[in-house]
A protein has these predicted regions:
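Aromatic- and carboxylate-enriched substrate-binding clefts and catalytic-loop regions
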Residues: 1-169
């Protein structure tokens, strides 16, 4: 991994990173995780998958953030917007899912619609309304659409704000 070549840059030319905030502890608990430029996703996953397929009895893989995160890259030499990132993510998911003897069950987090073609499992799917001001009722649209098509789950109960309401979903 080359910091200069493979890591996403922000618009002010800094390297982009992700941190995880814990509302319980009221501080950042995750280390700085560097975001890989979308153009290099396929490159990294191709190298990884060659080694991964050599493992015995492997039938699936979780590629969490490929289901939700689209990173722009403001590198001066190779700038990419979120639409470019979506194309790169789809290409990576197609390679990861494989076909024939190399086919894997893929699991993602969030599961944006462009991932549905390649995945079998979605975690943290939004099972409720978007809560837009013009919404009169909460309709579990995503659950209705995906039911029977793939396995999906919403937010874990211990992460919900209202456990009783979450049980009803």
């Amino acid at each position: 991994l080359s910091l200069r070549k493979h890591v996403v840059k922000t618009i002010d030319d800094r390297y982009s990173s992700k941190r995880e905030y814990s509302p319980t502890m009221q501080k950042y608990v995750g280390y700085y995780q560097l975001a890989i430029s979308p153009a290099y996703l396929s490159h990294f996953y191709e190298k990884f998958m060659k080694k991964y397929h050599k493992l015995d009895n492997v039938t699936g893989i979780s590629v969490g953030t490929l289901g939700t995160a689209l990173n722009s890259d403001f590198d001066d030499d190779e700038p990419y917007n979120r639409e470019d990132a979506r194309t790169f993510v789809k290409r990576a998911l197609e390679y990861i899912a494989g076909s024939g003897d190399q086919a894997l069950d893929v699991m993602v987090d969030g599961g944006n619609v462009y991932t549905w073609k390649y995945v079998r499992h979605i975690l943290n799917a939004p099972l409720d309304s978007s809560r837009y001001i013009r919404s009169s009722y909460s309709v579990p649209f995503l659950g209705v659409v995906l039911h029977g098509y793939m396995n999906f789950a919403g937010t874990p109960l211990n992460m919900e704000g209202d456990v009783e309401y979450a049980k009803l979903k």
